[in-house]
Amino acid sequence: MEEGFRDRAAFIRGAKDIAKEVKKHAAKKVVKGLDRVQDEYSRRSYSRFEEEEDDDDFPAPADGYYRGEGAQDEEEGGASSDATEGHDEDDEIYEGEYQGIPRAESGGKGERMADGAPLAGVRGGLSDGEGPPGGRGEAQRRKDREELAQQYETILRECGHGRFQWTLYFVLGLALMADGVEVFVVGFVLPSAEKDMCLSDSNKGMLGLIVYLGMMVGAFLWGGLADRLGRRQCLLISLSVNSVFAFFSSFVQGYGTFLFCRLLSGVGIGGSIPIVFSYFSEFLAQEKRGEHLSWLCMFWMIGGVYAAAMAWAIIPHYGWSFQMGSAYQFHSWRVFVLVCAFPSVFAIGALTTQPESPRFFLENGKHDEAWMVLKQVHDTNMRAKGHPERVFSVTHIKTIHQEDELIEIQSDTGTWYQRWGVRALSLGGQVWGNFLSCFSPEYRRITLMMMGVWFTMSFSYYGLTVWFPDMIRHLQAVDYAARTKVFPGERVEHVTFNFTLENQIHRGGQYFNDKFIGLRLKSVSFEDSLFEECYFEDVTSSNTFFRNCTFINTVFYNTDLFEYKFVNSRLVNSTFLHNKEGCPLDVTGTGEGAYMVYFVSFLGTLAVLPGNIVSALLMDKIGRLRMLAGSSVLSCVSCFFLSFGNSESAMIALLCLFGGVSIASWNALDVLTVELYPSDKRTTAFGFLNALCKLAAVLGISIFTSFVGITKAAPILFASAALALGSSLALKLPETRGQVLQ
């Protein structure tokens, strides 16, 4: 009996050993089956969606995640938990692996995990399309990117170029147009706003500076975020910030609040250029990219023309205003500020109908979302071309395994602002790390060279484009001063002045018992004169001064002759009653000078149209570097003609010439920046370079305008040297014509 029992026990143990070996081989076979199902490009596991012949014999576990030979075995007793106790010495797993989280140690089973299917839906682990940190070498990631770039280019060619790209072209063009408008808004409203807000010269300078400062911050901020959160989402947010604060700035009354609103408006629009060019380029095949990105640049010009035309049409109409007491005034220049927010608002509405960049989806492991967008591009273009029957044949697309560590905060962890703070810090760290990677050994030389090109181009371009109008105003002032009439030693008694005096100098005059009622004084100076028993009522003045004058028994009623207009003058027994309210500063207001600002800006922006057309047609034929260097050399040569600009018309002509030849270099620089950096760094690098561009613009404007009225040699020398240096640096960059988008 005992011998039979021992035989039976030995038989049971042998059967268990056989069953155990069978299950091990079954698990290996299932893994091999899943490897066949796994997409060659996306490395996603489709075990939940596709059936194989092996599944009937070897059903997969419920969670569907396999890690090589480390598959789970059922416990012999069946009562223990597989997650905690269901393993033996030969087939060891740990609890986290059962939940889909890979082991931390490398080697053995870890090698299978490095090449295996990415994890999906894992809390606290890696997102879909991501590999374990450090599990894939940089060489493998580079190889994956090259494969993705080649496949993505092939897919774009299959999708074709048609209605979808042209629709996106006009949508993104509105966003770029909003950036062009923003640059001109402050300059156009200053002649009118300076009186309403009582702006001193330092206040006006700060207002012009704050716009560039906001755009500099916005370019870096939104450019970095767009590589992490998506092009479309960040562009929508940035345009929303711009439109909201541009709207507020048209209603606020104080200088401080207006300055704050324009700062945040600039921060919002700063993300437009780096995101728009990156976004559009990722829908363009290689043979179309250079040309159509250059066509897109035309909308920046349209923005400048729109701003100049609206300023010309709106600001001089003083009837387009209302006033609520003396505290709230809404003049025509505020209507202009409001109208300038329209391109941004329209861009937001149109952008909501467009999809996210499929290249961004693929870079972040979102295969299905990218496939849907590319199918939309294909179907839209095929229907427009009359081929609705054509089917999008792509089934699998390569995705990049991410190495960034993701952080997920449970809903019961701390307060809501603590969770948001942790997420913000995590996102900020990722953005900063991505920015620093632009200076890695692989990209350091390109980044430093591009910094030099962007800085020199911006320094010379913005410096000269602001210097031109200032020089025109200086020439106007010189011509105006040459027509000044001088009245020496006049004696006037018992006369009533009720008309306008303009551009006059009265020296050594004597005025006895005269009345100045309803008088308008513009650029009038009284020097060494005597006023006795005179009466001033309802007098308005601009650029008017009394120097070394004496007033005896004189009354001033309802005038704007404030104390600072009396220079070294004596007032004896004189009275000021009910001085005019408003700004006590001497401002020029609107007039012929303001019209000239609009006109010059209109011509200057319109003059770049021929250069835009030429650069778009030749960009893919002669290459980016030749276009950039050639345009820079022509711009450098055009600077030497500035020495012949001794009249107003000559300076306007030279401004148009410089703008027309320099725009091609900007178009080439935008295309080159897009193509030199990979998709995961594209908007980050573009945003940083654009921020550097705004810094160089501030320096160029400050330096160039300081020489107005002193010499023209210094601006010519600085601009020529900067352009020559930029063109020489550009020739050392790699040519990107004919290359697929990284």
Curated annotation (Swiss-Prot):
Q: How does it sit in the membrane?
A: Multi-pass membrane protein
Q: Which domain of life is it from?
A: Eukaryota
Q: For this UniProt entry, which segments traverse the membrane?
A: 170-190, 206-226, 234-254, 263-283, 295-315, 335-355, 448-468, 599-619, 627-647, 652-672, 686-708, 713-731
| General function of this protein | Plays a role in the control of regulated secretion in neural and endocrine cells, enhancing selectively low-frequency neurotransmission. Positively regulates vesicle fusion by maintaining the readily releasable pool of secretory vesicles.
Q: What is this protein called?
A: Synaptic vesicle glycoprotein 2A
Which GO terms of type biological process are on file? intracellular calcium ion homeostasis; neurotransmitter transport; regulation of gamma-aminobutyric acid secretion; synaptic vesicle priming
Q: Which residues carry this modification: Phosphothreonine?
A: T84
Effect after changing N498Q: No change in uptake of BoNT/E or C.botulinum neurotoxin type A (BoNT/A, botA) by mouse SV2A/SV2B knockout neurons; SV2A apparent molecular weight decreases. No change in uptake of BoNT/E. No change in uptake of BoNT/D
Naming one, the record's GO cellular component terms include: presynaptic active zone
Cytoplasmic domain ranges by topology: 1-169, 227-233, 284-294, 356-447, 620-626, 673-685, 732-742
The uppermost taxa in this organism's lineage are: Eukaryota, Metazoa, Chordata, Craniata, Vertebrata
Which protein family is named in the record?
Belongs to the major facilitator superfamily.
Per its record, what are the GO molecular function terms?
protein kinase binding; transmembrane transporter activity
Q: Which SUPFAM superfamilies match?
A: MFS general substrate transporter, Pentapeptide repeat-like
Q: Which residues carry this modification: Phosphoserine?
A: S80, S81, S127, S393
Give the Phosphotyrosine positions (modified residues): Y480
So which residues have sugars stuck on them?
Answer: N498, N548, N573
Q: In which tissues is it expressed?
A: Widely expressed throughout the brain (at protein level). Expressed by neural and endocrine cells of brain and spinal cord.
Quaternary organization: Interacts with SYT1/synaptotagmin-1 in a calcium-dependent manner. Binds the adapter protein complex AP-2.
Which keywords does this Swiss-Prot/TrEMBL entry list? Cell projection, Cytoplasmic vesicle, Glycoprotein, Membrane, Neurotransmitter transport, Phosphoprotein, Receptor, Synapse, Transmembrane, Transmembrane helix, Transport
Q: Where is this region: Interaction with SYT1?
A: 1-57
What is the annotated signal peptide range for this record? none
Q: What else is known?
A: Identified as the brain binding-site for the antiepileptic drug levetiracetam/lev.
Spans of biased composition, class Basic and acidic residues?
40-49
Q: What is its main location?
A: other
